[in-house]
A protein has these predicted regions:
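Short beta-strand scaffold segments in enzyme catalytic cores
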Residues: 76-80
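Nucleotide/phosphate-binding catalytic cleft detector across ATP-hydrolyzing
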Residues: 1-71, 83-92, 96-183
Length: 183
C-alpha cells in the first residue's frame, strides 16, 4: 500500500522520491520503531529520521519554548522544548478514540458513527459539553507531564485538536495559554 502511494505521488510529481522520515508515538521506539522503519524501507525509501510525533510536529511549528501536545487517535504525546531543544517527551493513553467512545455512549451510536459525528464541525458546539470531562483528563495529563518545567505555552497538534473549543478548556484547566493551528 505504501509503495503504491509512493509510486502514485512520484508519477504526479514527475520525480523519484528517495528519502523519508517517519514519526511514532513517544516512548514506543522499541515497539514501533522497527516496524515503521521496515514499512518505510519496504516502500523504497531510505529513512532519514525516526522521530516521536510531537517532536516531528515541532519541525514545522518551530516552537522555541513551551510544550507541543499531540492529541492523537489513542494517545496524548507531549514534547517539552527549551531554546528549541526537546528536553522531555512523554505519551499517555487518552486521545480521540476515547472522545468517540464517550459520544457513542452518550448518543447511543455505533463507534464508527460517533467518530464521523465528532469530526463534523457543525456538531462541535453541541458535543463540547459532553466531551468536557475527557478534555479535562487530557489537560490533567498535560499538567502532570509538564510539572517541574517552565512551560509558558501549549501548542496543540493532532487530529483531536480540530475539535472547536478544546484549546479553551485545556487552557483554563492548566492555567497556561493554549494555541492550536487553524483547521
Amino acid at each position: 500500500l505504501v509503495r503504491e502511494m509512493k509510486e502514485e505521488l512520484e508519477e504526479k510529481l514527475g520525480t523519484e522520491l528517495l528519502y523519508a522520515a517517519a514519526a511514532i508515538p513517544p516512548g514506543t521506539d522499541a515497539l514501533d520503531g522497527g516496524a515503521i522503519k521496515n514499512v518505510v524501507q519496504g516502500a523504497g525509501f531510505e529513512i532519514t529520521a525516526l522521530l516521536d510525533e510531537p517532536t516531528a510536529a515541532n519541525q514545522i511549528l518551530k516552537i522555541q519554548n513551551g510544550a507541543v501536545v499531540d492529541i492523537g487517535g489513542g494517545t496524548t504525546g507531549i514534547s517539552i522544548l527549551e531554546n528549541g531543544k526537546v528536553i522531555n517527551v512523554d505519551d499517555e493513553a487518552t486521545g480521540g478514540t476515547h472522545f468517540s467512545l464517550v459520544l457513542a455512549g452518550a448518543y447511543k451510536l455505533p463507534f464508527s458513527e460517533a467518530e464521523i459525528y465528532k469530526r463534523d464541525k457543525k456538531n462541535h458546539k453541541e458535543i463540547l459539553p459532553v466531551l468536557k470531562p475527557v478534555i479535562e483528563k487530557v489537560a490533567s495529563i498535560i499538567s502532570r507531564q509538564i510539572e517541574g518545567y517552565n512551560v509558558q505555552g501549549l501548542y496543540l497538534v493532532g487530529g483531536t485538536c480540530c475539535l472547536s473549543g478544546i484549546e479553551d478548556i485545556i487552557g483554563k484547566k492548566t492555567g497556561i495559554p493554549t494555541y492550536k493551528p487553524e483547521n
